[in-house]
From Swiss-Prot:
InterPro entries from the UniProt entry: p53-like_TF_DNA-bd_sf, SH2, SH2_dom_sf, STAT, STAT_TF_DNA-bd_N
Domain SH2 positions: 449-548
Keyword annotations of the record: Activator, Cytoplasm, Developmental protein, DNA-binding, Nucleus, Phosphoprotein, SH2 domain, Transcription, Transcription regulation
Homology family: Belongs to the transcription factor STAT family.
Free-text function comment from the UniProt entry: Carries out a dual function: signal transduction and activation of transcription. Required, in concert with transcription factor elt-3, for up-regulation of the vacuolar H(+)-ATPase and acceleration of lysosome maturation at molt. As part of the innate immune response to molting and injury of the adult epidermis, positively regulates the expression of epidermal antimicrobial peptides, such as nlp-29.
Species name: Caenorhabditis elegans
Protein name: Signal transducer and activator of transcription b
Entry annotated with the keyword Transferase: no
Gene null: resulting phenotype: RNAi-mediated knockdown almost completely abolishes induction of nlp-29 expression upon infection with Drechmeria coniospora, or upon injury, or in response to phorbol ester PMA.
Keyword Transcription regulation: yes
Gene name as annotated: sta-2
Self-association state and partner proteins as the record states: May interact with sodium-dependent transporter snf-12; the interaction is probably direct.
GO cellular component: apical part of cell; cytoplasm; endocytic vesicle; hemidesmosome; hemidesmosome associated protein complex; nucleus
Amino acid sequence: MSSVVSDQMDIESSSAFSPAEPVVDGAFVSKHNLSAEAYQGFKECADSLLSGKIAQNEQLPFIQRTLQICENVILNFEDEKQHLMSDVLLVWAMKQQKLSIATLHTQQLHYKELDLINLQFEYFGELLQQTLSGLDYLKQYYPNVGFEEVHSKVRNLTHYFLYYSIIVSRQPPSVIVKCGEAENHRRSRFWFNTEIRILGGSAFGIDTNNENSNVNCYLITDETAKQLLNNAYLDIFESEEFCIEPNTSTFQKKDARGIKAKFDDMKVAKKVALRRDSVATKRYCLCYNIQLQTNCGIELVGKKVSLPFAVLVGPKADVEAKLFLERSFADLVRHPLSDIPTHVSCAEMADALEMKFQAIIETPQKNTDGPSVVQPRKFNMQTKQHLVMRMKPNNQGFLPLDNFMKLPVAEEFQHKKSASAEGDWKLVPFYDWFFKLAEITNKYLYSMWYDGLVYGFCSKEDAENILRCIPRSVLLVRFSDIEYGKIKISVKNRNGEIRHHWYEHADLNARSLNSELLSNHKFSDVDLIYPDIDLEVALGGRNKPRIRLPRNLAPDEIYFDNQGAAT
């Protein structure tokens, strides 16, 4: 089974972690060239008819030939539209869903891909607009010969294309915790930004006709969202429990990258007093009311709905874990509000865990702190394999998602309230163990993690094998596999002996691990932090013990004369 997992893990990660070179969409170029060639044939025919160059007795067969060319134009347009909608925008949106659990840096890299997509939509939109314009004249000067039907087909294709060019380009987080001023709570997300963006559309005047126009946003339940799937014109009523602020924005065009409506610093406010359990099982969506004008008479009216999320009245880790699985693995773009699958591949889970860990350690400590946009540190292959193996994949290399939520992987000693020395051991499921270590890294080990001084996820046996390969004295900072929320320091001294020390997060709150490694005598004979980082250089140097020097006495004669008085 481990070989199956290894083969899966060797597959290149599908996540966007670093800037990529601009990719030329060869399929789009090919399809667009075919569309442009077909349009050119239509344009030549239209110019001939409208210029009066065709003799009266030749007009009817020429019109029939033009109509046949129009059908070919429509076929090419449909093919290009299908590519842009399915192979480009749908793929982008599905990846957007998966990356919505990742760091702002990773999400921003993906967001920038919309600039190229916007350009592709502009190119296709220009062809559609020019074709519609030509057909407008043809049906006016040559009525009742078939141009009305062609115009209707192209207009419907254009309407569809323009409406689905309106996207939720920035999604809300999977969990919004509404818990007062609990600034220190992990991953509390009081404020977030969303955005509606229109791709292309300049040829139809969408940018000029709708700049500064309002767009309203509503907080709706998933039940209302399900009704919208069947009726896009459904009257929307806000959730009775929460409201969203701000609930209105305006479309703005600040560059040549399309028109956008930004909803910055959004937050959820309670309308009534609520119990945690009353809302923990519910899902909510943001619904944006769209009403846009074009210069060709097409009106774009409808509603755009965000990915679902949970609103919690206070922290609830198991709900956060379930929403992590939903955003990572459910097919919410093609099948809105669909269920989470029962199994996923090891590679998919490894990528999702990596992005979630990166996002948690980038979470601001306080809701007053600004967002951090830095390139995250990647997991190495050993880390990914270690994590997925802890969830016990099956022989085919797939992981039951129930194991993420329910499989015990660690234990925690919980003291009884009545007696501090007594208590019971509690089993901790994978998600709680994993989230806790990410939280500890965020609060106590942030700099060391980014400097590569924390190895991270590693078993005791693997740590010992790793250390034996290093000829000098070395230590390795890792997360405990068995004991909940503990940091382990595995040390190989200069004699080759290996020992392990552990620290609870409360210990790290009292004194940083950096200071502990420099000042504790247990680590005084250690030269390196794994793999070959000089400990003193990395951590700032040890405090050398002060060597007591003999006092330089220079007694005078009076000193010796008085020595007899002392005896």
